[in-house]
Amino acid sequence: MIKAVVFDAYGTLFDVQSVADATERAYPGRGEYITQVWRQKQLEYSWLRALMGRYADFWGVTREALAYTLGTLGLEPDESFLADMAQAYNRLTPYPDAAQCLAELAPLKRAILSNGAPDMLQALVANAGLTDSFDAVISVDAKRVFKPHPDSYALVEEVLGVTPAEVLFVSSNGFDVGGAKNFGFSVARVARLSQEALARELVSGTIAPLTMFKALRMREETYAEAPDFVVPALGDLPRLVRGMAGAHLAPAV
């Protein structure tokens, strides 16, 4: 029986694309490009550091990825800009259905497991007004690895006192879905973009940076096991969990 629902943060509960407003203000006309390449390199650097055994916390990785991205445009980040970007990342917009989804999942244990550094995650959750929605906000920093390393998912067992069979893991990121399934969790993928919608964007002509991001990050990975469930939005998750757990969840508002 499911006793805990554990969420990825970036891209699942919080929209990483919302940082584009800040990058566009800083570099008009180049904000979308910066946002997409930055996120891509952020993920790549976390995986490369994990493979090389050279851990740095997620804000360090994020700064490295931003420096790379600006370098492709011949730009150098200054400390003022980096401070602004840190604030932007700590104030990412939660998806519109996130708060309601979390409320409806009570009294099951609700947690975040994220690559984010502890201070980043605490600020992110607090700024969104969601602190009371979680029993735990778990950072991989405690293990000095990044998802999808198995040690990162083991933190859920240690912190929440549950077995993999008692966890439903929720993510919109293909690499995270694969990692969580590999660890032994039941997994629900939030599929906000249908294959049909993506195909229409890809054949429409010029591929915008955001469309490329969708192609790279918003599909299931072919190398990994498929998720147990697919939901189009977080608002559909409580109904799924009720069916799985027979749980007495908070009523929909």
Curated annotation (Swiss-Prot):
pH dependence of activity: Optimum pH is 9.5.
Give the record's keywords alphabetically: Hydrolase
Under which name does UniProt file this protein? (S)-2-haloacid dehalogenase
Q: Catalytic residues?
A: D8 (nucleophile)
- SUPFAM superfamilies with a match to the protein in the record: HAD-like (SSF56784)
E.C. number(s) listed in UniProt = 3.8.1.2
Species in which this protein is naturally found: Xanthobacter autotrophicus
Q: What does the annotation say about its assembly with partners?
A: Homodimer.
Which superkingdom is the protein from? Bacteria
